[in-house]
Swiss-Prot record:
Belongs to the class-I aminoacyl-tRNA synthetase family. Glutamate--tRNA ligase type 1 subfamily. The gene is gltX1. Pfam families: Anticodon_2, tRNA-synt_1c. Its EC number is 6.1.1.17. It comes from Cereibacter sphaeroides (strain ATCC 17029 / ATH 2.4.9) (Rhodobacter sphaeroides). This is Glutamate--tRNA ligase 1.
Length: 471
């Protein structure tokens, strides 16, 4: 049988639908997606919904939306772990038949009494079932669980692509339950059965699952199945080095969409969070697929850095195709529950992207810079801009308007007219630009007056100048 690493790569992302898609989960999904896509492999999605009390359809929908926004497409249908419970129970019974598991009739009260006595005597509280080697003829007619018969001596060794060689002393591991008394499988069994049946070759997940790998390896070996390649990645910490929590900022992937970060920038940043390719900070998803490997993942927790996130996102906005940028802005507005752009606003915004997209790190920032293109007359000036509209400035705007009406409305012609007008009036261009910015945008900081005029067009420009002159 070929080693897992020699077979076509199959990875999976297997979240529990008990809440939103956490940013850490988004990064785990991304690493699995990149590893599979870069090797022409398969990326699968499984929803681990065996906890019926906490799992909700709404949480599943939120996970799917988060993955879709990130652009992480999966192969085939989404697998429900709960729907496979009969298969899990079948494997538990097969382990029983193989002698790799046994029926345990100990009650919860008996187990707790054992642990209390062990604590009182200073012994290990690791439960050792008296039913492990019991003669089946002595089994009572009573409820039972099925426990795996784990080795009690030696060690289980995990060769991890990130953590290196990790050794677990078998004497420290108990005989875990694989099937409950009500016939439902435990998570630890279900994960292994699903990964085996789905053909998963590489298990890439958070290092909080590292201890599980030892027990899960025992299940693989008990069933004679090939053990996958393990890669346990460090968790994400806050900027202060502590475990990521709400006080550090947004935790859910969808929150980042609603805050206006571009998906490509988010993918780039999350890929770089704990993985590196030399000194490269900015890269496309295609480059990440080519470059990504498990050896580039560090063992230390990565720290979330919002300044770096914004820097990377700004670079992605600057190079995005206009049509793609418009689609993402529309999706951002919907996610943030903000009004959609009107046809006129969208037309003006797309026309002005050339002057806007290299100046913004997020979509809200871009839209703020595009206010001149999105607002309707009359344009309300803020306090700073209003100071530029004194009686002299209004007179200048009245004189300038007829000259602009005759312009061809090219950038060259507009530059020539405004430069000549400023020269004729004996003023620097900045002196002329200030009232123009107020009239066109109501702000003191704007794109160039030429760009604003070109974006909103002749009629709107003249109407705004006339409004300001008459104010």
């Amino acid at each position: 049988m070929p080693a897992a690493s020699d077979k076509p790569v199959v990875t999976r992302f297997a979240p529990s639908p008990t809440g939103y898609l956490h940013i850490g989960g988004g990064r785990t999904a991304l690493f699995n997606w990149l590893y599979a896509r870069g090797r022409k492999g398969t990326f699968l999605l499984r929803i681990e919904d065996t906890d019926r009390e906490r799992s909700t359809p709404e949480a599943t929908d939120a996970i799917l939306r988060g993955l879709t926004w990130l652009g992480l497409d999966w192969d085939g249908e989404v697998v429900s772990q709960f729907a496979r419970k009969d298969r899990h129970a079948e494997v538990a019974r097969e382990m029983l038949a193989r002698g790799a598991a046994y029926k345990c009739f100990s009650t919860q009260e008996e187990i707790e009494a054992f642990r209390e006595a062990a604590r009182a005597e200073g012994r290990s509280t690791l439960f050792r079932s008296p039913w492990r080697d019991a003669d089946p003829t002595s089994h009572p007619d009573a409820p039972f669980v099925i426990r795996m018969k784990a080795p009690r001596s030696g060690e289980t060794v995990i060769e991890d692509e990130v953590q290196g060689t990790v050794r677990f002393q078998n004497e420290t591991l108990d005989d875990m339950v694989v099937l409950r008394s009500d016939g439902t499988p435990t998570y630890m069994l279900a994960v292994v059965v699903d990964d085996h049946d789905m053909g998963v070759t590489h298990v890439i997940r958070g290092d909080d699952h590292l201890n599980n790998a030892a027990r899960q390896t025992m299940v693989y070996e008990a069933m004679g199945w090939e053990v996958p390649v393990w890669a346990h990645i460090p968790l994400i910490h806050g900027p202060d080095g502590k475990k990521l929590s709400k006080r550090h900022g947004a935790l859910g992937v969808e929150e980042y969409q609603a805050m206006g970060y571009p998906a490509a920038g988010m993918r780039n940043y999350l890929a770089r969070l704990g993985w590196s390719h030399g000194d490269d900070e900015f890269f496309t998803s295609e480059q990440a697929m080519d470059w990504f490997d498990l050896g580039g993942i560090g063992r230390s927790p990565a720290r979330l850095d919002f300044k770096k996130l914004e820097s990377v996102c700004g670079q992605h906005i600057a190079v995005m195709e206009d049509a793609e940028l418009m689609r993402e802005i529309a999706a951002y507005l919907a996610a943030a529950r903000k009004p959609a752009l009107t046809d006129l606003q969208a037309e003006r915004l797309e026309k002005g992207l050339y002057a806007l997209k290299d100046r913004a790190k997020t979509f809200p920032e871009l839209l703020e810079k595009a206010r001149f293109a999105l607002e309707s007359r009359p344009i309300a000036a803020d306090d700073a801009a209003a100071k530029a509209l004194d009686p002299v400035s209004r007179g200048i705007l009245r004189e300038l308007t007829p000259m602009l009406q005759a312009a061809s409305w090219s950038k060259q012609d507009l530059e020539a007219i405004l430069t000549a007008f400023a020269s004729e009036k004996g003023m620097g261009f900045g002196k002329l630009a200030a009232p123009l910015r107020t009239a066109l945008a109501g702000r003191t900081v704007t794109p160039s007056v030429y760009d604003m005029m070109l974006v909103i067009g002749r009629d709107e420009t003249i109407a705004r100048l006339e409004d300001a002159a008459a104010a």
